[in-house]
């Protein structure tokens, strides 16, 4: 069953300006080590960061909190499964909120899609509760 849904659309130029103005202060505040390594190695660095930023916004909406109530930027991280499909890992406040949303006997499956078409980056997050024995 779907227990959370969120989406976000961001202007890549906004993220690019934040990177130019604040540099590592911005990237270290908002992104995990894995996200920074992935984005810093990309030709379109700002677009890569913007997609991950949008994913975090979408995820916070799917959690029903936004970036409040103990949910912080680095509590949500975009990672890729072995086949390359993106998903999210939630820790700390975001992980606690996710656990509180799950019905007894269920585990979370987070679906994520991210895309960009300059000047925009977009993300959709669906949080699904799946039976542990099913």
Swiss-Prot record:
GO BP annotations of the record are: fatty acid biosynthetic process
| Primary location class | cytoplasm
Name the SUPFAM superfamilies for this protein. Answer: 4'-phosphopantetheinyl transferase
Q: Which GO terms describe its cellular component?
A: cytoplasm
E.C. numbers? 2.7.8.7
Reaction catalysis annotation = apo-[ACP] + CoA = holo-[ACP] + adenosine 3',5'-bisphosphate + H(+)
What the entry lists under InterPro entries is as follows: 4-PPantetheinyl_Trfase_dom, 4-PPantetheinyl_Trfase_dom_sf, ACPS, Ppantetheine-prot_Trfase_dom
Q: Which HAMAP family match?
A: AcpS
Entry's NCBIfam families?
A: acpS, pantethn_trn
Q: What does this protein do?
A: Transfers the 4'-phosphopantetheine moiety from coenzyme A to a Ser of acyl-carrier-protein.
Q: What is this protein called?
A: Holo-[acyl-carrier-protein] synthase
Tell me what organism the protein belongs to: Agrobacterium fabrum (strain C58 / ATCC 33970)
């Amino acid at each position: 069953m779907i227990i959370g849904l969120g989406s976000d659309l961001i202007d890549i130029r906004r993220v690019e300006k934040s990177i130019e103005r604040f540099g590592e202060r911005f990237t270290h505040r908002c992104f995990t080590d894995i996200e920074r390594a992935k984005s810093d190695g990309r030709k379109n660095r700002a677009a890569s960061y913007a997609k991950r930023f949008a994913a975090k916004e979408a995820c916070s909406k799917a959690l029903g909190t936004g970036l409040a109530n103990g949910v912080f930027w680095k509590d949500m991280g975009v990672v890729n499964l072995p086949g390359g499909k993106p998903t999210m890992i939630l820790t700390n406040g975001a992980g606690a909120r996710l656990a509180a949303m799950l019905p007894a006997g269920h585990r979370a499956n987070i679906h994520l899609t991210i895309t960009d078409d300059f000047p925009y980056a977009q993300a959709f997050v669906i949080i699904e509760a799946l039976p542990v024995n099913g």
